[in-house]
Amino acid sequence: MNSLQQLSIADTLTTIRPGKIADRPFWNRFARQFIYCPAFEFSKVNGAASYRFHVCDRFGTDHTFTADSPDAPLTPIWAELPVGPVFVVVDAMDASGNTIARVGERTFYRNAPFNACYPPKSCSYADCARKTYEYLFQLDFIQELSKGIVDPDYPLSCYPSKMLSSIINGMVNYAEMNPERKADAMRIARGAADNLIKTAIPAGEPLEFFPLTYSGKVIKSAGGEKTIMMLYPASVGRAMLKLFAASGERHYLDYAIKIGEQYLKLQLPNGTWHLILNQADGLPNAANYCCPTGIMLFLEALAEACGDIRYRTVAKRGVSFFSDLIDSFNWEGQFEDVAAQKTPYQNLSKHIATDIYLYLGKIQPDAPEVRRGAREVQRFSEDPFIVWEQPGWAGSPDAFNERTEESLHTRNWGWLRWHTPCALEQYRCYVPVDASVAKMIRYFLLMYDLEKNPLDLAKARALGDSFTRVQCSNGRIPTWMSPESPLSDDWINCMFASAEALKLLAKYEEQ
């Protein structure tokens, strides 16, 4: 076992944010797989002197230990458990060691920890990023934007703010990378931006000037087709500022200011914004709040671009909302095509957790509480969302499902088709997504910058290496981390995110 493997195994004995400490809830009540040692929400039984844990692995071996509390972590046996399905039974015992009650049961998947021995990359990270940009540039949907046309045949054109803002950013980046194609790339960026401005909510309406979250034949929506998810106007605003900086064309800054003014009016006393607003009346469609990181970054950039400190003042108020999210650990998935979470912890994702510490890690890198929180979020983000390797057991997923329908491997769990290492998106889309891999590359690099722990850099590289191996010969990085998936299933915004993560990782290639 090499030094990185030793670091990895030792780290997996850490229990992430256990519940019932300082009244914290158990965040993992809906989690279905673990790399790090878990503890579960089992309640005490009157008259119990101790609690006996029976932990059955995929081979049928019963690992047992006794604890004073039914929610004790599985630390005594965690290192012994092989990768595969695990079935936990906890019994309450009296002072004589007799069973007096069944406390609870739990099924989960013991996921493989990072082992530092994966296949090498097939090309440099910089080359992989370049090929991805070349592939994206020639796509029909992107080329049509140079004529001001949004091709409705691309199914995901129904999410204009998300798709077109990513294309603006991507084409400005590509123009910088490839001067020979700068004019063409900038023409595409302008076409995407002009379309967003042209189709924005008209003046005089409650949400005037906001770009549309949904348009055309909508596949799925979080709150209805005539709603605005408040994350996305900020994404568009940041793209407009990037285009203004690259082109000098004032009307893109002017439109970003219009978006910024709406955020100033709509900020709530708690420092954030409602997640979803009805387009017709501007009222909240759901009780959920935004994680405000993206909005704050937009407002800070807007203040820098136009010199108006009001935007920076409003952005600073968002920091106060971070503490609520950090304390609750309710890192809900916030996506335009998934209904807003109604039950806490039911649909977790690593995105808003990592976004917060990517932000705090830049502005307060030496703060001990930021470093502690960032490490805790790294473990959380890896625990239920990274798959370092395919399961190596000979069991049947169908047999595993027979044990409980709430187990990890549902009928949709297609592990034999997954190209690993990979990262899963959210509980409600519990499959590999390249943008999730990209986010974790960026996050592991943040952790490496903060602490210089070689394990973080090794994990970032392992994920980047996976990109180089899954990339198709034409430069495509499949959204679902499977070259067999149809081209029409690719999310362009995700591929741009992957290319940018690879460009960042290339800066660490020789370290």
Regions found by a protein language model. Give the residues of each.
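Solvent-exposed loop/turn segments flanking beta-strands in beta-repeat/beta-sandwich domains
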Residues: 44-59
